[in-house]
């Protein structure tokens, strides 16, 4: 996994989002095409589900990465752990896979199993809202190929972080994010594009 541009810390909500595996646009010999909306053939969490691990620092940064199929192992979460600051307060659901990561980072955890355990401060509403955005966008795009899911994760993060901004602020945000990656030669062309439709 490459170095992340920023980390999340202090109060962090962590959770997973599962989407069906999709090889859209690629014909695979011996594999029957799956029509949109049909369920997976295996029940529950299996290798037919892609896991998007999400960590959100409240009011600031979001990190979403896809590392594996099905339920993430503790090794997957340790690889994801480079984006988590040490000694953070982490709120998560009842998954035991996070224990090794949180111990290695010396983090305090709060397990929130159901909505009855939520209060004003301890909740997973932010990460669940982000997962709802992912679900809506994937439905709007009519599915995306799983090999590109991390690119779409980056797009979803940018859409979340620019919610409520006007187009000028969004343009400044994009330019700041692209500052060290690409050199934009014509700002006029970029202003005319609908980056966040």
Which stretches of residues belong to each language-model region?
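Residue-level recognition of single "structural anchor" positions
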Residues: 1-197
């Amino acid at each position: 996994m490459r170095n992340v541009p920023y980390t999340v810390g202090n109060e962090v909500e962590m959770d997973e989002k599962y989407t069906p595996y999709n090889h859209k646009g690629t014909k695979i010999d011996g594999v029957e095409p799956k029509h949109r909306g049909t369920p997976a053939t295996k029940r529950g969490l299996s290798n037919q589900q892609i896991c998007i691990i999400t960590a959100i620092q409240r009011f600031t940064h979001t990190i979403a990465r896809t590392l594996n199929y099905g339920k993430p192992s503790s090794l997957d979460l340790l690889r994801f752990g480079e984006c988590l600051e040490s000694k953070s307060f982490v709120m998560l659901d009842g998954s035991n896979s996070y224990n090794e990561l949180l111990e290695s980072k010396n983090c305090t955890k709060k397990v929130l199993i159901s909505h009855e355990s939520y209060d004003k401060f301890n909740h997973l509403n932010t990460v669940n809202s982000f997962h709802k955005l992912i679900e809506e966008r994937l439905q709007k795009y009519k599915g995306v190929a799983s090999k590109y899911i991390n690119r779409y994760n980056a797009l979803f993060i940018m859409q979340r972080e620019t919610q409520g901004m006007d187009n000028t602020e969004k343009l400044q945000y994009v330019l700041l994010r692209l500052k060290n990656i690409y050199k934009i030669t014509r700002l006029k062309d970029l202003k005319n594009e609908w980056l966040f439709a």
